[in-house]
Amino acid sequence: MSFAVVEGLARRFPRLSKEKVMIAAAEQSTSLNEIAFGDFLAQRSTGTEADAGLTDALSACSLAGIEVVSLLPGWVELRVPSDLAVISPLQELVAQLEAGLSPEVSEAISRAVREMLYNAVEYGGHFDPAALVEVKLIRLEHAFICRIKDPGDGFDPCTLDHAAINNPNDNPVRHASVREEKGLRGGGFGILLVRQLVDELVYNERHNEVQFVKYFSN
């Protein structure tokens, strides 16, 4: 293994020593994600119920094939397969990052993450596990930020006649009949719902990347 490779892996997992990176890469028996999980938990563990919850959440993410790109207190970056099976374990992780927030704020964040991730997996990744969705979760002192980028081509919001966000005022459920005609599953309230749940919601130009912010006071 070259020095450059070790340096690159060490930058990706800043909490791991180079010795751990080299051992993991050489043995190829334990993934760096698993070692990073263990190292992160060992440094923050106080033996509390919250630590046990985080351990379970991270283990569930690993089993679901979720790749950890960065794992720091208050900052988590993930690569997520476009598979509905990832939604539940990722929400468990989100719940750990919401520790100390009011039930109302926690519920709003969890629902928003779920809706945006579902859209990314369905419309961006087309339920193809090989298509990866990038997820960033950031917990600040008075805000929670979620950024999700899917591998799709994006969309034109003006053409989403199957989404509730474009229903005319005189027909607030028009999208339901459109979805039925197109053979789409029921729903279509995702973007509209998230706009009501969070304080800021913004897309990039292609509309294949979305960021929302939820503010709160401790």
Sequence positions of predicted segments:
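Helix-loop-beta hinge of the Bergerat
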Residues: 71-104, 165
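Conserved beta-strand-loop-beta-strand hairpin that lines the nucleotide-binding pocket
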Residues: 13-44, 52-77, 121-218
